[in-house]
């Protein structure tokens, strides 16, 4: 549903983001910590862009997503099937700014 995957911030339409963290590896707490910081930055600069952090584990679920390779590995889902390319491109620009602020500290 487009109203779940879309937001407007300062007149610009974005595909919302969802951070996914797999819990089926030894270092998942570090991944969660990093994603929480990134999510906080997203909420500060782009309120309403993030749908939050989805923690995945359990039978039939890939609870790793290569996040066991590095605590800096993140998975960000953008929008949904109803979003258009302009909304997704607006979001990729926002993500680049969010990651810049995260790396900059």
Regions found by a protein language model. Give the residues of each.
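Active-site microenvironments of hydrolase-like enzyme catalytic domains
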Residues: 1-23
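Homeobox/homeodomain signature
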Residues: 7-9, 43, 59, 64
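Short, low-complexity, polar/charged sequence segments that are solvent-exposed and flexible
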Residues: 9-14, 38-40, 93-98
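Solvent-exposed, acidic/flexible segments
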Residues: 12, 24-35, 81, 85-92
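Sec/Tat-exported extracytoplasmic proteins
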Residues: 21-23, 42-46, 82, 99, ...
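Active-site-adjacent substrate-binding region
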Residues: 27-57
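Active-site-adjacent mobile loop/cap segments within catalytic or ligand-binding domains
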Residues: 51-105
